[in-house]
Regions:
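N-terminal Rossmann-like NAD(P)+-binding domain of SDR-like oxidoreductases, especially those catalyzing
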Residues: 1-202
């Protein structure tokens, strides 16, 4: 049985992801790791808490030892990382907490996964680390289409009518342009994930 850790699984988006995986993949063991801060609510998952392939672990992703031990215990093959401080206004009042959770928490998970997976005979083969980011890392879009004309709703349409509509979509080549402590912390975590891929092959 494959085991997948989903961090932040008691949050709004995370709980939907956890429920989807628990119900869609009964042969997978789904481990929901959440610190249960103001954004987490286990009531979101009442309908699946008794499922045999589901486990909840209350833990802080910044706790490297706990994350490493959990990966060893569950023989984790995949991580879907949604846990994050995500309230822009809160980040302005308390940027340190956002840097700790979003940057150091992500780094803690990456390092734990790296050390666990690279010690296996097959190393990273068949292992995946999925990092969920935010469009906030790109800053704000400037709507440059003529007043009264709605922008297209596909990147193909945007490309075909670029002169009329301008840059109405974030695309793969959009440059990072974070402005708040929240978006800066998420941009930093994005770069760490890419660095671990490029440096270690994760």
């Amino acid at each position: 049985m494959k085991s997948i850790i989903i961090t932040g699984g008691a949050g709004f988006i995370g709980s939907h992801v956890v429920r989807l995986f628990v119900n869609k993949y009964p042969d997978y063991r789904i481990i929901n790791v959440d610190k249960l801060t103001y954004a987490g609510n286990l009531a979101n998952l009442k309908d699946i808490e008794e499922k045999s392939n589901y486990r909840f672990v209350k833990a802080d992703i910044c706790d490297f030892d706990a994350m490493y031990a959990l990966m060893q215990e569950e023989q984790v093959t995949g991580i879907i990382h949604l846990a994050a401080e995500s309230h822009v206004d809160r980040s302005i009042k308390d940027p340190f907490t956002f840097a700790r959770t979003n940057v150091m928490g992500t780094l803690s998970l990456l390092q734990a996964a790296k050390l666990y997976w690279e010690a296996l005979p097959e190393k990273y083969e068949g292992k995946r680390f999925y990092h969920i980011s935010t469009d906030e890392v790109y800053g704000a879009l400037e709507m440059t289409h003529p007043e009264g004309i709605e922008p297209p709703f596909s990147t193909q349409a945007s490309s075909e009518h670029h002169e009329a509509y301008g840059e109405d979509f974030f695309v793969e080549t959009t440059k990072y342009n974070p402005h708040s402590p929240y978006s800066a912390s998420k941009a930093s975590s994005d770069h760490f994930v890419r660095a671990f891929h490029d440096t270690y092959g994760m």
